[in-house]
Structures are given as structure tokens and as C-alpha cells.
Amino acid sequence: MSVDGVLNVLKPPGMTSHDVVDFIRKIYGIKKVGHTGTLDPDAAGVLPVCMGRATKFTSYLMEHDKRYRFEITFGFSTDTLDKSGKIVESGPVPLFTLEKLQEVLSQFKGEIQQIPPIYSAKKVKGKKLYEYARKGEEVEIPPIKVTVYELELIKYDAPHHLLLDVKCSKGTYVRALVRDICKKLEVPGHMSFLIRTEVGDFDIESSYTLEEIKEGKAEVQPVDKFIKFPSVELDEVSSNKILNGQFIRNTYNVENSLVKLYDNHGIFIGIGVAEGEKIRPKRLF
């Protein structure tokens, strides 16, 4: 069975992102399957999965911004920063004013620095951070730069629960955001709920449950639909040159940019690099 495209999967809580990939492999009977960005096992939500030749372009889909709905529960913090971990601190919970909450949240908008959670797959010195954590080894975690485009207070269920919505750049750790918000509020807390509602143009409304996928109700989308580069349609001669690994003359009014390349029938053939007067192939479909 030849399946080349992207599936917008609604990952349920309790499964790893790799579990979802294995599920898709079995359902479609194909080996080449890869997701476009890990979602924590306890989290649910949008997980775009590339299949077949579309897996060549997974890295381009990983660049997309993401949106999450999440809940902070005040009263205790954990080593994993979510509800699955061991309690490391507990304390009384004050009643916050909405003004105080908004004032603190405003400090996390724009470009910020985060320390990734120790229980994460982020690599430091060649090892994943959770490997250090499981062995009880100390490691210095360098901060990363991320961008928070939107951070909205959805509901304050006083005094213990805060529901928020965030739109952020790739690589943002929501658990770390929760940790840092709690630190600013001077109250122990953890992330008690997380759902990813958007990854670029993939949204939760158009995602498919595993049951729908199993029943054959899911629609596989063409991967180029979700790659955000300028499009260039080539004539037959130029298409053949690109497919044979050769460069072509850049007469398409695109400069110093990655471009989506289409043949003279409008069929996607890959990604090219426009450099000055030339366009060369970078990754072919």
C-alpha cells in the first residue's frame, strides 16, 4: 500500500507519540512513518504524522508555531512539573486578583528564556535530560530562547486552578512555562492538563481520533499543503533537470529562499533553494 502524505492525528492521553507512530504503521501497513513533534504521554491533541515519501519533509513541519490549552493547579509542585511526578513541594494557596494574574502573565509574552524540564527529551552533552534524571545525576541545563506570541487567561477557578491558552514557537516547554509562572506568583504548582490545539495549519477540529483512523474515515493530506514556502511551477525541461539533481536558471522572481517546486502538471516534486540566478534541488519528493 502506497501512502504518501500527512495525517492530522488526535493523540489521546496515555500514549507516547511513538506509540501513535506504531499504530499508524500497523493500520496502513507501511514502515516509513514519523511524527512532527513530540507530545508528552499525559497530553492529548494535534499530532501531525507523515507517511511514506512525506517523511522526507517532516523537519519542515516541525518549524510551525503551536497552540496549547493548559491548566495550572496550585498547591504542590512535582519533579516532572506535571501531575505524573513526585511531589517535591507543597504549600498554602493564596487568592489572586485577576490584575495580579494578568500582570504576571504579561511577563511571559514575547521572546523569553526557558530552562527545559529535567524530565524531557532535550539533549545536553549527548544525553537526553530524562536519562540524567532517572539516574539521579546532576547536569547544568542551558536556557533556550522561545517566543510566546499569545498567553490568554481563560478561566480562574479560585483558588486552585488556572486555565490558560498559549500560542508559542517550536521548542517551547509548557511545563517550564507553568513552573516559571508559579515561581513568579510565589506558589507551588504543576501542570494538571495539556491539550495541543494547533500545529501551524493543523487544528484540533480537523484532526482524527485513532478509532476514526482504524475505521478508514481519516483523510491523508498532501504534505506540500503545509509547507510554507513560495511555490514555483516549472516547465517540462526544468522539471527533468531538477529531478536529475541539476540546477536551473532562476527566472521566477524568488531570491535567497527555499521554494516548493511543481512540475508542468502542477504535481509537487520537492523543495529547492533559490540562490541568485540559480535554483537547485534540496529535497525531492
Curated annotation (Swiss-Prot):
One of its GO terms (molecular function) is RNA binding. Its EC number is 5.4.99.25. It is an enzyme of class 5 (isomerase). CDD domains: PseudoU_synth_EcTruB, PUA_TruB_bacterial. It catalyses: uridine(55) in tRNA = pseudouridine(55) in tRNA. Responsible for synthesis of pseudouridine from uracil-55 in the psi GC loop of transfer RNAs. Belongs to the pseudouridine synthase TruB family. Type 1 subfamily. NCBIfam families: TruB. This is tRNA pseudouridine synthase B. It comes from Caldanaerobacter subterraneus subsp. tengcongensis (strain DSM 15242 / JCM 11007 / NBRC 100824 / MB4). The lineage of its organism: Bacteria, Bacillati, Bacillota, Clostridia, Thermoanaerobacterales.
